[in-house]
Amino acid sequence: MKRAYGLEIPETVEEAIDLDRTALLVYDMQVGILRQLRHGGEIIAKVADVLAVAREVGLRTCFLRHMSLPKNLMGVFQMRQALAWQRKASMDDVHPWFLQGSDAHAVVPELAPRETEAVFDKIGMSAFEGTPLDTALRDCGVRVFVIVGVALEIGIEPTVRQGADLGYIPVVVEDACGAGDDDAGKRALASLRYMGDAMFTTVSEITTLLRRAHRNQSGAP
């Protein structure tokens, strides 16, 4: 831990983790997204491991969901995105995949949010853009967020970048973050490492650190 001008500047994930100042972000773990991914089941299992320990230690947890608007309200951004993602040439063939209340929009049942956990819907890629997430985290005194989910190259990378710009310390759980395209996911991680804004960890390490922080905080042996 570095100290300067009254500030504590963590250099490791262990130094960054303070249960009262840390939140877990579960990004876009939705039925309609996971069923498109080759390794969807593996990512669900990894995210479930992190979520279980976060719940065990009482970590604040927020879920993010990608939301489609009805077709007549999609606007230029969502229409262009839908044409690209659905590989369609005509707007007549495009369908809003993630309408609120649809099966595709729901979080996968293995990770079903609890009443004590927030769920924020978004139409953009960054979890902070157009959602109350930043306000909610700041009001709870959160300074660090641990992020898991999908997809690295689409939404997790911009969330980490914007979070860092907002003054948070992002902690990316690499093996609990999936990608739609493996090469693109690797490039996203490499780019985040190059920037130096985020910290990186694994499911094994972060679950160990969360439990250790909980023992230290509670005074348990």
Labelled PLM ranges:
Residues 21-53, 62:
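Short, contiguous, helix-prone interaction/anchoring segments in small proteins
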Residues 54-73:
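Von Willebrand factor
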Residues 1-23, 49-57, 81, 85-221:
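Active-site-adjacent betaalpha module
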Residues 29, 66-68, 175:
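Active-site loop/turn elements of alpha/beta-hydrolase fold enzymes
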